[in-house]
């Protein structure tokens, strides 16, 4: 009999800082009429890092929701929604050096210019 190790949370138990697999669950209530979640298969979601917070936001202004992610020892990570497939976006030079110990992320139009701004906190 073989035992499979199940990982949960943001790290592999006993192996900090090795991150566990990240995944996105889709609520299938509209399609099924029942409370059921399905795992969304996407290679860019699997090895993000030790995710601690995320938010849905139209980062690129194309009228669909992208995913913005932060975590322990992670840079700000943007998963751009391209036809309901989330693609990890290459960050601009000013955002590439955002690696930190992030635990919170909020999106809001702080300067009143009509687009969302992001606040990351540790």
Task: State each model region's role.
Residues 1-122:
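Beta-propeller-forming repeat regions
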